[in-house]
């Protein structure tokens, strides 16, 4: 009985990752109009985002990227959490001439939740 009470107490004290993941899923919802996390899905307006963290910018071979992203790829830029968060804040400022129409995510917490979500989907 004592060990059950201790486990119950610990479960209440430890932070849950469920709300954070829910925030990331919610933040990704508008992205689904153009992007997928299913590595097998092709033919969408935007590149597949499965495994985006650690991947070269403009790194999905069969996707037709804007010239600015092809240049970034040729320069060896890679997506990490910091670069992705800055990109999501203002994509066109980071890559002028970008074909993507998304203006950016103003809310810092929402951007961070989306980046964490993409990191977690990359590491699964």
What positions do the PLM features span?
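Bacterial N-terminal signal peptides
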Residues: 4-15
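C-terminal capping alpha-helices of c-type cytochrome domains
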Residues: 78-124
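Sequence/structural segment immediately N-terminal to covalent heme-attachment motifs in c-type
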Residues: 20-44, 49
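A short secondary-structure junction motif
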Residues: 52, 56-59, 91-95
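Residues at helix-coil transition
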Residues: 14-15, 36, 54, 89, ...
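Extracytoplasmic/periplasmic, Sec-exported soluble proteins
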Residues: 23, 41, 75-79, 106
